[in-house]
Swiss-Prot record:
Residues 87-97, 914-925, 1008-1019 have a biased composition (Low complexity). The gene is KANK1. The modification Phosphoserine is found at residues 186, 325. It comes from Homo sapiens. Keywords: ANK repeat, Cell membrane, Cell projection, Coiled coil, Cytoplasm, Membrane, Nucleus, Phosphoprotein, Repeat, Transcription, Transcription regulation, Tumor suppressor. Changing residue 325 to A: Abolishes phosphorylation by PKB. Abolishes interaction with YWHAB; YWHAG; YWHAE; YWHAH; YWHAQ; YWHAZ and SFN. Widely expressed. Isoform 1 is predominantly expressed in heart and kidney. Isoform 2 probably is widely expressed at basic levels. Residues 244-339 are annotated as: Interaction with PPFIBP1. This is KN motif and ankyrin repeat domain-containing protein 1. Residues 30-68 are annotated as: KN motif. Residues 22-31, 979-989 have a biased composition (Basic and acidic residues).
């Protein structure tokens, strides 16, 4: 198959990349005998000539080498793989024509630009238009091998070919429509994908295989275009027999007659096409003249635009002026407008800015349209010229190969040779023409300037706005049409109702009009005179009167003559008519009532006549005033005639009217009422069920999430004061206040005032931080006494705050008795716990036994430290008074020795609640640090003074708490090891619980407070503090809730001197409400996982990128980590939830991809979670709303099928399973046996799952691959209750048979389940009559869409 070439400067990237310098050399010398040619038709012809001649072509090939330097070969810098291409044109050209050999490739390539599309994505065809400008860049191939002389055998063959071509020409001309393609695929080296119907199927050869055999492998272009020709012509197919002799000096002679026949057929078609192309060539000069005229017109218009268009015009519309070869954008816009509107070039510079923008946008659009038209016209001209030149060459080649030297062909060839030489010469001319045409738009040259980009952007915006406008217009038209249709329907209904009412009205006036024969005329006259009154007062009365007027004249004409007989006869007819039109007569009565009321409103003069009207309808005697139509006529002397008329028809008409109306009203009301009720019931059932079932689950899940989050935050913040409502804001406010105090370096009075203002809760909010700590320190050991005065003690004692100080009542700095008694008790207890711990560690770990060699000496040192610390604190407590506590100087002097070591630890963690004031003070200079310590301690005196007396146990707790955290009074400093329960996520991984480590274990704490003080604590002292803290926390958890509330404050105040306030707050939360507050660690993705997720996010929409090596590594990492976290039996729901949140934060697409990852068996995390009964994880996965619930593993099972087999114990788990059923297809079949989830649940006796599946719409009658149903499975396994449940379903079919012809009844009998057989027998035989209607009943009474039966 000939190869398609592109002559533009850009080619496909792949081919361009492959063509390196070495390959260029190969393309320069591809025509030696030893080298494969790579172009099939050329080889075939060479083989054909060699077979006939049986000669040797080595000498001619040497001649090719000598002649090659004469061919113009520029630098191999052309970007595509076209540079060294020698198409198969030469093999079909005459062996004696040298002009075919000099530059055949370029002309043919020009024609190939317009060939059919190529499979490998080339650059757009617009970019290939300037191909005429690069003839010098083409490397022209050497001439094809030629014969030095014709022998007799060749001449005979060519003559025979000529004869057969002439014979078949008539046949070919019979169906000219089949050969409408402009070029042939295999003739003349065109390389197109022409699919000529009559030549498609000859020679069943594989194109890909042929490429490998015959294609030039060194060239990336040739193989890349093979897929573009799936339907090649027969010539190209037959030529594929020939690659065997492509590079052999002695060719293989295996040419078949079919091969020759194909060549003849191709040449016949080419000759026919040549004539068509000659006709097309004649139109080229005309088109060129048109182009020149258009270009001249363009230049004139551009000059006009330059004179008329102002520079500010473009600035308003936001588009810069663009420079084109034929003028700027604004000029071209105006040019297009001039062509369309006949030269309207005037621009109103005084228009509003908005209109200017719209005009400029429209001009840009018109400019683009003009550019496209010009481009299409030039493309058409160039294509026609290219086709003509190439086809001339093709036909010449055809003549030279197959026809020989007959006169007709020679004449044609001479003619075409001349045109072809003209084409060669005209290449330069075309180059100039192309340059002129290309100058219209730079985009045609492949150059995208910034101006073009802006134009494109505006064009896209215009197009999008057009589409929106179009859509809105369509919607508007549809809406308008619907409204008009609705109005027409309403008018039709109203007209119909009016017709009906008029008919009924016609009957009524017949009775009345007889009495008012003469009055009608008078009434007409009076209506005209009284129209003003009616219009001014009430508009409705006018309409009613007009209706009455129209009806009465008709009645008058009928009843003028015989009055009495007509009255009687009409009464009888009226009875029948009232039966029919009962409802309508009722409406008429209503209308008449409204008429009367309106008449009353019209004028006070006519009230007498109005009363007469009402009486006239109810009582016949008042028909004397029957001038109803003339209610206004009572003023005029027309009373005489109505009286006469009234005496005639009074009795009969009134009775008939009253009876008819009474009969009609009940019937109408009953019918309407029943209809309305039915409709209401139908709509109510459907809407209510749907809304309740669909919306309830969503709301509940949302509330649960929000509630848990808010509750944790609220409790954490509000523990100290008990003020739950003010907690959220006060927490953050306190921490801010701490920062302010730290920077201010102020004393006690100032910080407390700042606290009070910023917290927004009042003075008590900040002071409670101190008071809670003080109170709780004091209260921790004596629950009963301190709980009573809890509130008073909190608010009464204040440190450095004047408002709080005012509330103190008679402070008595008396120290409670028996402090040391309680202290000794707790010291002993601590010693015991330490000894027990060392003993256990030494027993369990032999390597630690040596480290614990002298436990008693260590205990003694620890004991001495505790006692010294506590005694110093005790002395301060005894000596300090409330006034001294408020005095910063006193605290600095008295407690300076105790503090000093705690500065670094206190100021590291910013406190949230009560600890914030203390932390703010402890971060001040050392002398103020002493005050922060002394403040809680000395305030103990003020606190118990209000209580009167404190129990020794309380004081002991206080001392112990102070001693635990003040044990660094000597040379060593203790680091606080208490960790936050939730783990500060931004800190360096604080532990979740307290560390319990042996004294000499050498454990290094990981608390977030890195010591900033000058002294550093030894690991031994750290461990000691750990050991002390752990049992104390255990002990306090055993106390009741009130004691916990106090002990929490007791710990907090002591910790404030040594630790961060954040730690104190979380201790309060932990101890005060341990059963409600849940504080846990947050699991975060590792750096490796984060990088993998980010890489997946960037390439998730690119299938090719997902298959790269790096992406496979990242996906393996994600899969391994995800299944490790989510798919194990021991998976942690909290961890899974954190991972899901992390994936969703990165990208919803990443979350969807990761959650639906499947392992080698096709199982996802949802499969594993259901199999392991980890229903909390199932809930998390379902809440993510990205799970593919219907995903089947390799065994064909979905998570719903696995859930049908799971064991569910808790009610909440069952709800999760039901939610899973509702999210997927409960009727999906397994790929292996075709079983559904209902069959699996029935087979394993899971009745709860059966109920859930049936509630979610599972079909009872689905059959698996063996024909079995769920009822058959239940009958076979003997599940009686399940059988009853299935039979109770609407539409359960007990007659179904499996592939063996067995029914559920026969299966139950074979298995020996007699009770089930009885049930089935009764259902099959006694429920036959009801079974057809059962599905309908189920459809009517179904409570909602999720509970419908299978046939609903």
């Amino acid at each position: 198959m000939a190869h398609t070439t592109k002559v533009n400067g850009s080619a496909s990237g792949k081919a361009g990349d492959i063509l390196s310098g070495d390959q260029d050399k190969e393309q320069k010398d591809p025509y030696f005998v030893e080298t494969p040619y790579g172009y099939q038709l050329d080889l075939d012809f060479l083989k054909y000539v060699d077979d006939i001649q049986k000669g040797n072509t080595i000498k001619r090939l040497n001649i090719q080498k000598r002649r090659k330097p004469s061919v113009p070969c520029p630098e191999p810098r052309t970007t595509s793989g076209q540079q060294g291409i020698w198409t198969s044109t030469e093999s079909l050209s005459s062996s004696n024509s040298d002009d075919n050999k000099q530059c055949p490739n370029f002309l043919i390539a020009r024609s190939q630009v317009t060939s059919t599309p190529i499979s490998k994505p080339p650059p757009p065809l617009e970019t290939s238009l300037p191909f005429l400008t690069i003839p010098e860049n083409r490397q022209l191939p050497p001439p094809s091998p030629q014969l030095p002389k014709h022998n007799l055998h060749v001449t005979k063959t060519l003559m025979e070919t000529r004869r057969r071509l002439e014979q078949e020409r008539a046949t070919m001309q019979m169906t000219p429509g089949e050969f409408r393609r402009p070029r042939l695929a295999s003739f003349g080296g065109m390389g197109t994908t022409s699919s000529l119907p009559s030549f498609v199927g000859s020679g069943n050869h594989n194109p890909a295989k042929h490429q490998l055999q015959n294609g030039y492998q060194g060239n990336g272009d040739y193989g890349s275009y093979a897929p573009a020709a799936p339907t090649t012509s027969s010539m190209g197919s037959s030529i594929r027999h020939s690659p065997l002799s492509s590079g052999i000096s002695t060719p293989v002679t295996n040419v078949s007659p079919m091969h020759l026949q194909h060549i003849r057929e191709q040449m016949a078609i080419a000759l026919k096409r040549l004539k068509e192309l000659e006709e097309q060539v004649r139109t080229i000069p005309v088109l060129q003249v048109k182009i020149s005229v258009l270009q001249e017109e363009k230049r004139q218009l551009v000059s006009q635009l330059k004179n008329q268009r102002a520079a500010s015009q473009i600035n308003v519309c936001g588009v810069r002026k663009r420079s084109y070869s034929a003028g700027n954008a604004s000029q071209l816009e105006q040019l297009s407008r001039a062509r369309r509107s006949g030269g309207e070039l005037y621009i109103d510079y005084e228009e509003e800015e908005m209109e200017t923008v719209e005009q400029s946008t429209q001009r840009i659009k018109e400019f683009r349209q003009l550019t496209a038209d010009m481009q299409a016209l030039e493309q058409k001209i160039q294509d026609s010229s290219c086709e003509a030149s190439s086809e001339l060459r093709e036909n010449g080649e055809c003549r030279s190969v197959a026809v020989g030297a007959e006169e007709n062909m020679n004449d044609i060839v001479v003619y075409h040779r001349g045109s072809r030489s003209c084409k060669d010469a005209a290449v330069g001319t075309l180059v100039e023409m192309r340059n002129c045409g290309v100058s219209v738009t730079e985009a045609m040259l492949g150059v995208m300037t910034e101006a073009d980009k802006e134009i494109e952007l505006q064009q896209q915006t215009i197009e999008s706005l057009k589409e929106k406008i179009y859509r809105l217009e369509v919607q508007l038209r549809e809406t308008t049409h619907d409204r008009e249709m609705t109005k027409l329907k309403q008018e039709l209904q109203a007209a119909g109702s009016r017709k009906k009412v008029d008919k009924a009205t016609m009957a009524q006036p017949l009775v009345f009009s007889k009495v008012v024969e003469a009055v009608v005329q008078t009434r007409d006259q009076m209506v005209g005179s009284h129209m003003d009154l009616v219009d001014t007062c009430v508009g409705t009365s006018v309409e009613t009167n007009s209706v009455g007027i129209s009806c009465q004249p008709e009645c008058k004409n009928k009843v003028v003559g015989p009055e009495l007989p007509m009255n009687w006869w009409i009464v009888k007819e009226r009875v029948e008519m009232h039966d029919r039109c009962a409802g309508r007569s009722v409406e008429m009565c209503d209308k008449s009532v409204s008429v009367e009321v309106s008449v009353c409103e019209t004028g006070s003069n006519t009230e007498e006549s109005v009363n007469d009207l009402t009486l006239l309808k109810t009582n016949l005697n008042l028909k004397e005033v029957r001038s109803i139509g003339c209610g206004d006529c009572s003023v005029d002397v027309t009373v005489c005639s109505p009286k006469e008329c009234a005496s005639r028809g009074v009795n009969t008409e009134a009775v008939s009217q009253v009876e008819a109306a009474v009969m009609a009203v009940p019937r109408t009301a009953d019918q309407d009422t029943s209809t309305d009720l039915e409709q209401v019931h139908q709509f109510t059932n459907t809407e209510t069920a749907t809304l309740i079932e669909s919306c309830t689950n969503t709301c509940l899940s949302t509330l649960d999430k929000q509630t848990s989050t808010q509750t944790v935050e609220t409790r954490t913040v509000a523990v100290g004061e008990g003020r739950v409502k003010d907690i959220n804001s006060s927490t953050k406010t306190r921490s801010i206040g701490v920062g302010t105090l730290l920077s201010g370096h102020s004393g006690f009075d100032r910080p407390s005032a700042v606290k009070t203002k910023e917290s927004g809760v009042g003075q008590i909010n900040i002071n409670d931080n101190y008071l809670v700590g003080l109170k709780m320190r004091t209260i921790a050991c004596g629950p009963p006494q301190l709980t009573v005065g809890l509130t008073a003690s909190r608010r009464s004692v204040g440190v450095g705050d004047d408002p709080v100080g005012e509330s103190l009542e008679n402070p008595q700095p008396q120290a409670p008795l028996g402090m040391m008694t309680g202290l000794d008790h707790y010291i002993e207890r601590i010693q015991k716990l330490l000894a027990e711990q060392q003993t256990l560690l030494a027993e369990n770990y032999s390597e630690l036994a040596e480290a614990f060699g002298e436990p008693h000496s260590q205990m003694g040192s620890l004991n001495s430290q505790l006692i010294s610390t506590l005694s110093s604190i005790n002395s301060v407590m005894k000596s300090a008074s409330t006034e001294e506590l408020r005095n910063p100087d006193f605290q600095k002097t008295s407690l300076g020795k105790i503090t000093g070591n705690y500065l670094g630890y206190t100021c590291k963690c910013g406190g949230l609640q009560s600890g914030s004031p203390l932390s703010s003070q402890t971060s001040q200079p050392e002398q103020e640090v002493g005050t922060s310590e002394g403040k809680p301690i000395s305030s103990l005196d003020a606190f118990p003074t209000q209580e009167g007396t404190l129990s020794p146990v309380n004081l002991t707790d206080d001392q112990i708490a102070a001693g635990l955290y003040a044990c660094t009074n000597n040379e060593s400093t203790l680091k606080s090891i208490m960790k936050k329960k939730d783990g500060n996520k931004d800190s360096n991984g604080a532990k979740k619980n307290l560390q319990f480590v042996g004294i000499n274990g050498g454990y290094e704490t990981t608390s977030s407070d890195d010591s900033s003080s000058d002294e550093s604590s030894s690991s031994e002292s750290d461990d000691e503090c750990d050991v002390i803290e752990y049992p104390l926390e255990e002990e306090e958890e055993e106390e009741d809730e009130d004691t916990r509330g106090m002990a929490e404050g007791h710990h907090a105040v002591n910790i404030e001197g040594l630790k961060s306030a954040r730690v104190e707050d979380e201790m309060q939360v932990q101890e005060c409400e341990p059963e409600k507050v849940e504080i846990r660690e947050r699991y975060e993705l590792s750096e490796k996982m984060l990088s993998a997720c980010n890489l997946l996010k960037n390439t998730i929409n690119d299938p090719k990128a997902l298959t790269s090596k790096d992406m496979r590594f990242c996906l393996n990492t994600l899969q391994h980590e995800w299944f490790r976290v989510s798919s194990q039996k021991s998976a942690i729901p909290a961890m899974v939830g954190d991972y899901i949140a992390a994936f969703e934060a990165i990208s919803p697409d990443v979350l969807r991809y990761v959650i639906n990852l499947a392992d080698g068996n096709g199982n996802t995390a949802l499969h594993y979670s259901v199999s392991h009964s980890n229903f909390e994880i199932v809930k998390l996965l379902l809440d993510a709303d990205v799970c593919n619930v219907d995903h089947q593993n390799k065994a064909g099972y979905t998570p719903i099928m696995l859930a049908a087999l799971a064991a569910v114990e808790a009610e909440k788990d069952m709800r999760i399973v039901e939610e899973l059923f509702g999210c997927g297809d409960v009727n999906a079949k397994a790929s292996q046996a075709g079983q559904t989830a209902l069959m699996l649940a029935v087979s394993h006796g899971r009745i709860d799952m059966v109920k859930g599946l049936l509630a979610c719409g599972a079909d009872v009658n689905i059959q698996d691959d063996e024909g079995s149903t769920a009822l058959m499975c239940a009958s076979e396994h003997g599940h009686v209750e399940i059988v009853k449940l299935l039979l109770a379903q609407p539409g359960c079919n007990g007659h179904l048979e499996d592939n063996d012809g067995s029914t559920a009844l026969s299966i139950a009998l074979e298995a020996g389940h007699k009770d089930i057989a009885v049930l089935l027998y009764a259902h099959v035989n006694f429920a036959k009559a009801q079974s057809p209607g059962t599905p309908r009943l189920g459809r009517k009474t179904s409570p909602g869409p999720t509970h419908r039966g299978s046939f609903d």
